[in-house]
Amino acid sequence: MADKLKFDLVSPERLVLSADVDAVQVPGAEGDFGVLPKHAPFMAMLRAGTLSVQNDGKTQHFELDGGFVDVTPEGVTVLAESIGE
């Protein structure tokens, strides 16, 4: 089985998505970036834009209005001000 990335997408109102995924594309404040399993840890601010989640050949898109991302060896947590699909 290929490595997966533990991913949580959270808004102030609710947990929008919690899943093991292949990759995440994030709209960073200083430019878009991708996160794969075992990525180096860091935190970053997010700008308004599209977050993409890839898993098993399928992609989900979410519209964010900014927030923060926390990348750890265990996974990624996106805390967004608001989230639309």
Locations of regions flagged by a protein language model:
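Compact, glycine-rich, soluble single-domain proteins
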Residues: 4-85
